[in-house]
Regions:
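C-terminal transmembrane helical hairpin of 12-TM major facilitator-type secondary transporters
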Residues: 273-317
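Short amphipathic helix-loop junctions that connect adjacent transmembrane helices
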Residues: 34-47, 228-243
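Juxtamembrane intracellular "pre-TM" segments in multi-pass secondary transporters
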Residues: 2-12, 187-217
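Helix-breaking motifs and short loop linkers at transmembrane-helix boundaries and internal kinks
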Residues: 44, 76, 97-102, 292-294
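Helix-to-loop junctions at the C-terminal end of transmembrane segments
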Residues: 65-75, 258-272, 356
Length: 388
């Protein structure tokens, strides 16, 4: 009865403003990501340079996320989110106006360095909500990612009808509007809750390190999946670009449904740590099935396992990080987690590509399942006394 009541508790004031800020930010990202490779090709970029272009965003994000997270702990969440959105707008405009490949890299580096808005938004959500609400709220924040990845590519495709550079200008305009809206409507959450005594014992810091390691080994194979699934689908199932886009659309919708509708009730029933382990097992099993899939039913089953597992595990892990972090350093800790995930997104795609080229079509996913087992082992063996 108490669990049911807690699930139905109203969300704190300001939540939907933060949610809409992240959703609009992800729409802009969704506009750019699918077309960036073809856009770079116009500047004579080869495949390796396109890979570096994608990696440059994650590298900049890896470096600056902890810095901006620490800054948000000192000056507040709102100014850092606003500055990040302004940086995203500048990076998008530079990318759209690029006349040479190096300018394109500059735009992506600026955009990546400004990519701390997500981890700072997660910190703002954690500031607003009581620990028992965080999993639900962070899951719903994850739903904003799904909305962005569904709406963004469609909007980018329409914008591209006006020219290859237009989608980047559209993304820049959206980020500018988002920044203005954040200045007007976004609440400052850093002072919304009274500072409470927090554990600062060494074991708690070890717990945070464990969560970051788990996040890295969870993100690494999933980033490889995102990078090589189109190659796998084309080789084994004759999927066209439109077919691959439809698959990712379905993935985004299912992920949004899981994170927006299921994670709250499931967390209140089972707890974040058990859900993390369940989600990890689902993803590992899904990747094994995907690597072996040669018929459509197995493909759909594998993708369902992966998406449901990731939809459960990701917000559960973020909740555990947020609950383990001292309140005064929550932004820095969540920024460090995002930095670790960004590093995995730098390493994962080229590793998966090498496995595809030199081992076999399904190798990225079979090996990915093995890598994911490392995350499962760490989650199972570490003594995580602060888990809730």
């Amino acid at each position: 009865m108490n669990a049911e009541k807690s699930v139905r508790e109203p969300l704190p004031r300001g939540f939907w403003v933060i949610w809409s800020t992240v959703a609009l930010d992800m729409v802009g990202f969704g506009i750019v990501a699918p077309i960036l490779g073809r856009y770079a090709d116009r500047f004579g970029a080869n495949g390796f340079q396109v890979g570096l272009l994608f990696a440059s965003f994650s590298l900049a994000q890896m470096v600056f996320s902890p810095i901006l997270g620490r800054w948000s702990d000192r000056v507040g969440r709102k100014p850092v989110i606003v500055i990040s959105l302004i940086g995203t707008a500048i990076g998008s405009f530079i990318t759209g106006a690029a006349g040479a490949l190096w300018v394109l890299f500059a735009g992506r580096l600026i955009d990546g360095a400004s990519g701390a808005s997500v981890s700072v938004a997660q910190s703002a959500i954690a500031d607003l909500g009581a620990p028992k609400q965080r999993a639900k709220m962070l899951g719903m924040l994850g739903m904003a990612f799904g909305v962005g990845f569904v709406v963004g590519p469609a909007l980018g495709g329409l914008a591209a009808l006006g020219g290859p550079h237009v989608p980047f200008y559209v993304a820049g305009v959206l980020a500018s509007i988002n920044a203005v809206a954040a200045i007007i409507r976004l609440p400052e959450t850093k002072t919304a809750r009274e500072h409470q005594p927090v554990e600062t014992h060494e074991h708690k810091h070890r717990n945070i390190s464990s969560w970051v390691v788990i996040g890295f080994f969870s993100t690494l194979p999933f980033a490889g999946f995102e990078a090589t699934f189109s190659l796998f689908g084309g080789s084994r199932f004759n999927l066209t670009e439109a077919g691959t886009a439809a698959v990712f659309l379905a993935v985004g919708i299912l992920m949004s449904a899981v994170q927006g509708g299921l994670i709250g009730p499931l967390t209140h029933k089972f707890g974040s740590l058990p859900l993390l382990r369940i989600g990890q097992v689902f993803v590992a099993v899904g990747m094994l099935f995907l690597g072996a899939a040669v018929v459509w039913p197995v493909l759909f089953l594998a993708l369902a396992f992966m998406v449901i597992g990731a939809g459960i595990a990701s917000p559960s892990l973020t909740t555990l990080v947020a609950n383990s972090a001292p309140e005064a350093k929550r932004g820095e800790v969540l920024g460090f987690q995002q930095s670790s995930n960004a590093l995995a997104r730098v390493i994962g795609p080229p590793l998966a590509g090498l496995a595809f080229d030199h081992i076999g079509v399904g190798a990225p996913f079979t090996l990915g399942a093995g890598i994911y087992l490392v995350a499962i082992v760490v989650a199972s063996r570490r003594s995580l006394h602060s888990a809730v």
